[in-house]
């Protein structure tokens, strides 16, 4: 802090108070400001809350109001009025009458019977404009005014001390969760150390351990905040919801400092406190603490989500400071092992080097590092006396050849090689006893040679052309997370060799005299394994695997039918889904008014990006690749979608006529697919049919066939559970649960000639009766009508849409499936379902009522027959509707199909439907019924919405599909009764009972839009009528009344 500047402003403040001391009215003696997190005048983060503290003097008998002004750089003040207390009694209040200014008024409600001097405080934050001016460390003077008196105070904005242990934290306003950081200097990790963070006794919150991050900071800004960091994974994390607890027992080097970031779940209070403790285990005493002056056992912190008044005193206390520069202390016995931290380097050769810095390890185990930026040749060698806990970190971003060699002395500790982005690096370790871990990250060509080792573990995070040579080792484990092209892993004399690779290509594993060797690649292409006494291969997705000299009796194989795949060349289009939190959903009606709906269900926004080359991304995702014939192969992989480019295309192309083998160590067959993708397409209202065959082991195969045209194949990865509410016209509510929300995907178009897909699943079918389920919860559904009005319905029970029992087909739950539907307009909607779609081709449902037929995802076949599918998407009832062909009203429907004279079957979908102004249904034009995600022809338009709440209450547009069955008891032409299906789409009336007079039936038949045979003669006495079709006289038909 600039002490001279502070003294000057204090002198000015004292001179200003000289007059005030002689007055009898209340006065402010002082106003100061401190950082609420550090409890000092030093601030390492401008986002911190600041404590404004004033000292008030109230003379005996005084009751006058006074004012004071806070600098315009501050805002976010507490709710006023708030009290000023003395001995727990309120003696005054503070308010801000004009909220547009920073002028405060202190009001004294009663005259005091004695002289009172007390303090008050409240929280404030810098405004956005004030924060933008703090771009580098500086000291800023803030001036407060009260009754012609100025009080000045200084805040020093300083960079954090990277050589000390520091903490930081805050509370997000968006979701009311807290974050914490602990920054540790690299020397903290000379010995194993525990980091523990807990809530204080006055706070009640839990940690979200899934979000904890560990990073090595390699570049910082002017405040020493990270601008570049590398993730670090070698941490023993024992954290729970109640505490963060981590053990670091590895040497960490190569960065400026180490950062631990962790988070809480949603908070229930506006302020919390936290403690951080560091301990060294196994150092003679039961607990070895890192503390300031060896007196502080914890680092405490207070966080606030909103402003408050009268918080704890801001008096600085050295023994409880939470953000001070706390230097790790060590006993003399500990320091003895680090007395020699550098030594002469026996051999250093640097040629054509712009910058080169090399530090060799010592006898006591200090680290060896090399930075050979832009060098052509770099050589580092260490002496043969190197003994314990050595670490070699190599950084050669642009070097051509770098060689690092350690001699063949007997070692007993861990050797760590970190090789980053080099053209050619060779690391040779002659001999050691315990173990060695070799890590090669993002490099082109590397050679790692070990002549003798008891245990060797090689981890290759992202490599190409890496050679690991082991002459003699008891156990050799190689784990390349992503290895491609010409990778050779060899060992001449290894007792046990294990190769574990989620993604390998062109890999050769050879062992001249290996007692045991196993390969576990979930995705392997073109692999060869030879010369192993016992070989175990587990490859859920393997192509062209060759094994020689194998002696094993524990391999079982199961296979599924091959698929023919073909991918066109070009960039791979991937989709990214962002979904979190609470959303406000806005929909538009025909008159351009907006209806706003609040929803707790996230709405997924799918953005399309084109990737032409692979990226270094890992994680557990589903990788979907589409083929020319609209098939989809889904595999679980450690690679995100964006990394599947030409390699994935090549692998898919190589899958032609291949057998997928799943080898296990048990005697029973296991399925090769743990997850499947179910693909269905609808183009030009063509029918999708399915055939099901069940094998002896209970599995079923579904074959789907559709017509010709383009299709869209894409997929997303969702795993949460949401509740979907749908409403019907009669103001009833039905709730449905779905494992996946609806995602609207922008298209990836694949051109093909046909779509024939076969999928395998374990399922069994059974006939069940559709029933209604009572639910005890209350729901409120808001839907918009065609006239831009909003109707809200509330109901305690869901709807039962059928008056008579209807037999439908359902399937048992049998694992996880993904359903993707496509439209001709190149958009796709994906549904997640536990129940696969099962198609009943040609099934017919009739109701002899005034209501329409209720079906789920129906398509038209022949004479208005229905193919019904069971689905997680509910179906609406269209009650009492009729067809109007003379108006110009828009037809609004969800997933509608047209049959006959512009009749349609309406379905309630998880994707809403928008009203398109000006569209109409006309039999004399080629315009189609406008619907959400519908197939469009000629001049028809369509609209796209992403919405989880269906809008299906229509005010003026009503339609009816009623199917009646009339049975002829006596027929002349037939020897047995038959049924005639008649279309009563636009009728005058509908016969309601068998006692209806025949004249009524004649009138009804004559008015039918399908123009049934005309009735020219009717004889009531004889019970006969004459039927003509054109000029053809069919004769007399007798009937019974």
From Swiss-Prot:
One of its GO terms (cellular component) is cellular bud. It comes from the Eukaryota. The GPI-anchor is attached to the protein in the endoplasmic reticulum and serves to target the protein to the cell surface. There, the glucosamine-inositol phospholipid moiety is cleaved off and the GPI-modified mannoprotein is covalently attached via its lipidless GPI glycan remnant to the 1,6-beta-glucan of the outer cell wall layer. It comes from Saccharomyces cerevisiae (strain ATCC 204508 / S288c) (Baker's yeast). GO terms for molecular function: cellulase activity. InterPro entries: CST_Regulator. Residues 1021-1041 form a propeptide. This is Protein EGT2.
